[in-house]
Swiss-Prot record:
Swiss-Prot/TrEMBL GO biological process terms: translation
GO MF term list: large ribosomal subunit rRNA binding; structural constituent of ribosome
Keyword Flavoprotein belongs to the record: no
Source organism of this protein record: Colwellia psychrerythraea (strain 34H / ATCC BAA-681) (Vibrio psychroerythus)
Protein's job: Forms part of the ribosomal stalk which helps the ribosome interact with GTP-bound translation factors.
Top-rank taxon: Bacteria
Record's subunit section: Part of the ribosomal stalk of the 50S ribosomal subunit. Interacts with L10 and the large rRNA to form the base of the stalk. L10 forms an elongated spine to which L12 dimers bind in a sequential fashion forming a multimeric L10(L12)X complex.
This protein's record includes keyword Ribosomal protein: yes
Gene Ontology, cellular component aspect: cytosolic large ribosomal subunit
Protein name per UniProt: Large ribosomal subunit protein uL11
Family statement drawn from the similarity comment of this UniProt entry: Belongs to the universal ribosomal protein uL11 family.
Length: 142
């Protein structure tokens, strides 16, 4: 018989830097999950990613206090900021442009995010990421 799901927890944790302090500790502690076990497993799984990159994770907690987790790819905004070499996006993206990204950079980002994107084709995915770039105040160049 399948285990009964007790909770579904969504967090964003820095790659390789999960520790019992907030936000991880309180979120898992209230469901009785072994926090250190999660931290060790998460850090081992995100070892190959860039240190400090925010990684969305979905943790499924079962009624016997066991858990499974699935990591996603870093947010598009993080990847776009890294590609453009900026610290943050524009507060007024329509008037203040803060950087530029090329179509080649967008395609690299799409390849990174491919498992999490629902776009039907590469071109559609590039258009999606280009829209995110424009909403951050980045100029998209061919």
């Amino acid at each position: 018989m399948a285990k009964k799901v007790q909770a579904l927890i969504k967090l964003q944790v820095a790659a390789g830097a999960a520790n019992p302090s907030p936000p991880v500790g309180p979120a898992l502690g209230q469901h009785g999950v072994n926090i250190m076990e999660f931290c060790k497993a998460f850090n081992a799984k995100t070892d190959s990613l860039e240190k400090g990159a925010p990684v969305p994770v979905v943790i499924t907690v079962y009624s016997d206090r066991s858990f499974t987790f699935e990591t996603k790819t870093p947010p598009a905004s993080f990847l776009l900021k890294k590609a453009a070499g900026i610290k943050s996006g524009s507060g007024r993206p329509n008037t203040d442009k803060v950087g530029t990204v090329t179509t080649a950079q967008l395609e690299e980002i799409v390849k990174t995010k491919e498992p999490d994107l629902t776009a039907g084709s590469l071109e559609a995915a590039v258009r999606t990421i280009a829209g995110s770039a424009r909403s951050m105040g980045l100029v998209v160049e061919d």
